[in-house]
Every structure is written in structure tokens, then in C-alpha cells.
Amino acid sequence: MAGKEYVCVMKLHSQVPIDRLKKVLQEFQGTIYQRPPVRSSVKRRLRTRTIYYLNFIEMNERNVLFKVGCEAGTYIRKLCYDIGEVLGCGAHMQELRRTRVGPFIEDESLVTLHDISYLFNQWQLTKDESILRKFVYPMEKALQLMPKIYIRDSAVDALCHGAHLTAPGVLSLDSGIKIGDTVAVFTQKGEAVTLAKAFVSSEKMLKMDHGFVAKTQRVLMPRGMYPKMWRSKQ
């Protein structure tokens, strides 16, 4: 799952020195433990989440503005509560704005519904696809931060029919893939084929000449885009 970035206003329940506040914010960078809030859509089990950065921006009386980059599934309102507990004054989330999800950044990716309506009408009149590309991105953009495996053309159609990826079909791959990681499988041209779960690490995958290396979880490419190079069992 893609990491996220937020800008948050945290309300302190009493005043604290700014130096003390900055020090505590730095303590929350890295791996933290979180139990989801009472009002949440998941079971309230203690779990770990990664805070990639937590940057202080400004403080106005008891209102603290900060930017946080975090692993998906991190509850910012719980983060504010925990910061307040460590400070000893208590705190809660006052305002929250998400500014990034994976490769999609607020300043670069957002369009209004009015923009979409206008551009769609323009496309209907002109049939100029470049107009749509102003707000419709190829799905590969959403996958660009995921670990990737590139495959031979001969393996593409089999995967499009739900087959698992075997070692002979692999051309190249990103380093650092671990067992159980979700990976994006691409053609040599950079077209997304499937999302898959790695059976082995990238180091072992490079040494294999046969056997399954990744389990297909979601097919992204329609069947028949590449020639069929496999045979069905009779």
C-alpha cells in the first residue's frame, strides 16, 4: 500500500514550550505502535506503523501545524492523542488535509469536478485524447512506487488468464523484494500486467531457472493483448 502525507493542525490542551514540542515530535519518527481509535473501521489490535517524517511547521498559541509522511493505515488523530500523552498536556486533531498518496501529489494531481466536466465535454466535441490525459492518468502511474518484475512477452498472456509467474518468464526485477511482498508485474514496454505476491526474495528469484516465483492476485491487462504462447492441458 502506498505511503501518505498529511498536513495537520493539532490542538494542545495546555501550553508547552516549543523546544519540548519539537523534541517529542522527533521521537515519533520511525516505527511506532498504534491501537486504532474506538471509532474506526478495523479491529482495535495493537500494530506497528512507520512514520517516515514528522516536520514541525509552526505554532500559534496551542495550535500546532505539522507535516507527516506515514505508512498507509496510520491514524493521525491517534498520533495526535499519543503526542499529547507524551507531552503530558493532552492533544487532539483539529484539522487534517491529505497532500499525497503514493506518487499523487496534491499540487500536481488534483482537478475539480468542474474541470472534469469541462474537459470531458471538450473531448466529446473534438475526440482529442490529449484533452483527457490532462486529468486521466495511465494506471501505471499509480504503480510506479511498487517493486517491479519485468517479464518476457511469451509469459504475458498466461498471466492475463490468471496463471502464476514462473522463473523462466522473468527478465529483470527490482532489488529488495521479500517473500510475501506485493509486486507489480510489467511487460518489457512498461505495461502493467498483474499484481502478484512474491513467493521468494529477489536474490533467490535471480538464481532460479524453474518454479513459481510470484502468485497472481489481480490481473490488470485484458486477455489477448499479447499472443498466446502456452498450451492448455488436454
Where are these regions (language model features)?
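A generic structural motif
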Residues: 64-68
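Short flexible coil/turn linkers enriched for glycine and charged/polar residues
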Residues: 2-3, 47-48, 59-62
